[in-house]
């Protein structure tokens, strides 16, 4: 097989423009060599009313639903992941460049999939009801 040593991943755009928030993947397809590290990039923009953003990464294999891998919050340096997400996946967030990336360490053929980035914004407000 000619391409047995290559990984091909296809990426789709996911965005939420209802409030002026948007996320875009920089490449439609990335080809990597087996055992190398692969990095996937998304840029985002937030409306002026969006104080915080959650940037998610999903993996979808043929015939399956997207599987949540991990996410980062713009206002935090913590990376949150599902219990099943392997240590080979990590994400980075550069708020000055408005960019997030997913790194796949030691890429293997079984990592061939569609990887999706997604953006969700929240408005945090607290409501109190005082009772006497």
Residue positions per predicted region:
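N-terminal Sec-dependent signal peptide, specifically the hydrophobic helical h-region
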Residues: 1-29, 119-132
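Generic leucine side-chain signal with a strong bias for well-ordered alpha-helical environments
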Residues: 7, 13, 69-70, 102
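Solvent-exposed, conformationally flexible loop/turn segments
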Residues: 33-35
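Extracellular beta-strand/loop-rich beta-sandwich domains predominantly from IgSF
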Residues: 27-31, 78, 82-110
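Structural signature of extracellular immunoglobulin-like
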Residues: 37-47, 54-61, 103-105, 111-121
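Small disulfide-bonded, cysteine-rich extracellular recognition modules and tandem repeats
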Residues: 26, 45, 60, 69-72, ...
């Amino acid at each position: 097989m000619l391409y047995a040593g290559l990984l091909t991943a296809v990426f789709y755009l996911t965005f939420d423009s209802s409030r002026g928030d948007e996320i875009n993947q920089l490449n439609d397809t990335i080809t990597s060599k087996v055992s190398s590290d692969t990095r996937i990039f998304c840029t985002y923009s937030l409306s002026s009313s969006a104080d915080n953003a959650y940037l998610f990464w999903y993996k979808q294999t043929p015939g399956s639903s997207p599987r949540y891998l991990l996410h980062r919050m713009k206002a935090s340096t913590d990376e949150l992941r599902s219990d099943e997400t392997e240590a080979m996946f990590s994400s980075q967030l550069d708020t000055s460049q408005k960019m997030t990336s997913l790194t796949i360490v030691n890429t293997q053929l079984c990592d061939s999939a569609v990887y999706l980035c997604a953006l969700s914004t929240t408005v945090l407000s607290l409501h109190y009801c005082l009772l006497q």
